[in-house]
Amino acid sequence: MVAEASTAVRAQQKDNLCGPFWATRLLRDAGIDTWDGEELDEDLIALRAGTLLPDPDDGSVPPGAESLTGYRFELPRAEPSASGTAAGRLAEAIEEASTGTLRCVPMRGAWTEQRITDLVERARGARLLANVRTGAFWGSRPTLDVLVAELRGERVDGPPADWDVGHFCALELLVRGPGGALVLVHDSYPSFGWDGRHLQPPRAVAAALQRDDGREGGVLAVAPTKDSAWLERLARELGLEIGIWDNGTTS
């Protein structure tokens, strides 16, 4: 499904467009670069998915990152608590832009360390787009000693989170050690970790999906439509629900 990342996709998202950024990246990786004759980019996805920009906007950019607000379209605005991109609208945009060749299987439920481990390990061939609260993550630059300890099976404390917002990011793979595992998370800000990638213990990813801030998190598992039925079976085997979650966005 996945080709080399398109050079037409910028390295960093525009402010508040994390969901559209990842939708654009996975669509372009699947060879889809236009939608109804228009060039496919995060701005077009944001417009079609009903993304709401926060008004006022104070805190949308993590420390150390540049603010990018050169939007191609006039996007609607809402109070910060209601801003963002709704998971259901984002899934619809991905499927429509792909003209039905891609399918998003939405997964929600009680996220646990074991479910995260099993999902990331077994969902090979799919793209996992996670809607999280970043404040539950470790900071993106833990020391080598901390990472090695986790892989040995020790439960250690990582650095505090870099920021605390609702966010979309990709869960790419599972790294196993002799006693533990770490999830490779790919962020839309290359200032995090190693060019946007950082390692998180599965329990931190589970906590980020649980959120505990009055909103819900979840995962969009994206795969070619003709090969997507196994993702529903996997979700059920893991005890997850198939359905869209409420991330608080009113779009």
Predicted regions and their residues:
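Solvent-exposed loop/turn segments at secondary-structure junctions
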Residues: 25, 134-137, 190-191
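N-terminal start-of-chain detector that recognizes signal peptides
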Residues: 77, 100-103, 141-146, 154-157, ...
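Noncatalytic regulatory segments and standalone regulatory/sensor domains
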Residues: 152-166, 170-251
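Cysteine-nucleophile protease catalytic domains, especially the papain-like/related folds used
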Residues: 2-126, 223, 228-250
